[in-house]
Amino acid sequence: MSTVRRILVTGATGNVGRRVTAELVAAGAYEVRALTRCPETAGLPPVVEVRRGDLSDAAGLAAASEGVDAVFLMWPFHSAESADAVVAAIGRHTERVVFLSSGSVRDGVEPDAQSTPVGRWHRAVERRIEESVPAWTHLRPSAFAANTRWWAGQVRVGDVVRGAYGALPTLLLHEADIAAVAVRALTEGGHTGAAYALTGPEVLTQAQQVRIIGEVLGRPLRWEELSRDAARRRLLADDGFPDTFVEPLLDGYAQMMTAPRPTVTGTVEAVTGAPARTYRQWVAEHAADFV
């Protein structure tokens, strides 16, 4: 496998992609190319080569992939329909892909037999990558800590956060930890063929997460349980999420409520040498998002 010098980051202005880009730039040893829909507002470091485009444009993606040694690939779609075109466009130009997959994917299970919609489409993309790229690494993160920003609107106007499945246990993961693992997989040897299950360091219910936000902000926040239908209406109307996102989300939550309690992995520390950050750390760093 050739030495990695030039790296393409897709989703470079997102929670994880921006961190990946920043770490690669800080290392000072790589040429970083970023793919974004709007270069004018990307706000990336001047040394980054910014290309206009997205994963829905296979031709543009192929052009952005020319001359790169590795690609950080995220998947913004709610299906795997375009996976063949996307992976083919990348695979013609690079030998190494680090894919931001999902913790919903289950090992040894075919895409169509995965237990959640998210697991099905992410495993389908994984399969395309495995068939097309010689050096691949899948990152399967647990829930993103950043996703709890969707409570910010409720937190700003009161001390009650309303939603469904407040007892749902999750392993919230800091985006900086995902990025740190991604950078090592992009730039180091020894990660080919790995599917890393990445988790935060503690199991927290949604109600506990709300309480932690309140403790960091110095406010008595509490969770109020809604029915699934009421939560769906809130997510669609008040929070503005599309139905294609809300239904798989709630389906996944319902299945997770009856699944075995999630297990903390030590993968972040094993790969990076540093323990995974806590949710309280994430909230402290992003407290301004809730005020």
Give names to the regions the model predicted:
Residues 2-45, 56-59, 66-68, 77-84, ...:
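Oxidoreductase cofactor-interface core, primarily capturing Rossmann-like NAD(P)-dependent enzymes
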Residues 53:
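Cofactor-binding loops of NAD(P)H-dependent oxidoreductases
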Residues 60-64, 279-282:
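Hydrophobic alpha-helical packing elements
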Residues 229-291:
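A hydrophobic C-terminal alpha-helical subdomain
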